[in-house]
């Protein structure tokens, strides 16, 4: 997102999307060719059929350099702990090439497929990312009691205690990208994440979205965050 005009800032990604009735024909060949040609990243997606992680691990194992991203993992499909586990695992297996793309999805999928409520997506996203980052840092056992996630669960058997991942992350700062469309969600991406996965983006709206991102950068407390934000 930096203001540099050099062509080196242009990165190419290859998105396989989510599956239709089965695996997309030629996806593996396309991914291997993208890797050979020097593409920056390849991406998988999920809705209510194929998941994003399994194809990424399977196809990604046959690449060498390209970054491997989820565009997106639906937060309602997994607890923050499960997402952090998957991120650490794939990052190890890919030798530090994983990008964790997250998104809230929408009520039609969250309620209709996962059978979960769709409350306050902005606040829930903020808390979700906070928990994932805490797990990845592995500084201490997770003891988080927020509005949406209660770890360890209070009021249960009493046997649940704060835990710390047995796996040491290859990178404690695995990049987290946020799939976002609305202005508040885009600003949230700029504030708490490392990149933004836009939906229905048009270049003619660039100034509008830059304003949203800049609002988020200002709230992040990180100087010059726009220089590294993707």
What residue ranges belong to the model's regions?
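Active-site-adjacent structural elements that line small-molecule/cofactor binding pockets in enzymes
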Residues: 1-230
């Amino acid at each position: 997102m930096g203001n540099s005009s050099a062509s080196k800032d242009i990165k190419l990604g290859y998105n396989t999307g989510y599956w239709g009735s089965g695996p997309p024909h030629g996806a593996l060949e396309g991914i291997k060719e993208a890797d050979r040609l020097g593409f920056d990243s390849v991406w998988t997606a999920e809705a209510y059929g194929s998941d994003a992680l399994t194809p990424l691990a399977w196809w990604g194992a046959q690449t060498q350099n390209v970054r491997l991203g989820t565009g997106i993992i639906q937060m309602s499909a997994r607890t923050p702990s499960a997402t952090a586990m998957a991120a650490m695992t794939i990052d190890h297996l890919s030798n530090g090439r994983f990008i964790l793309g997250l998104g809230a999805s929408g009520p039609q999928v969250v309620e209709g497929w996962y059978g979960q409520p769709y409350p306050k997506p902005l606040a829930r996203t903020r808390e979700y990312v906070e928990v994932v980052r805490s797990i990845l840092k592995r500084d201490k056992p997770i003891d988080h009691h927020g509005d949406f996630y209660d770890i360890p669960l209070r009021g249960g058997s009493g046997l649940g205690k704060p835990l710390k991942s047995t796996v040491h992350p290859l990178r404690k700062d695995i990049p987290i990208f946020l799939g976002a469309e609305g202005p508040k969600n885009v600003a949230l991406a700029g504030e708490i994440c490392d990149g933004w996965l836009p939906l229905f983006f048009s270049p003619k709206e660039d100034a509008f979205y830059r304003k949203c991102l800049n609002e988020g950068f200002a709230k992040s407390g990180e100087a010059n965050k726009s220089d590294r934000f993707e």
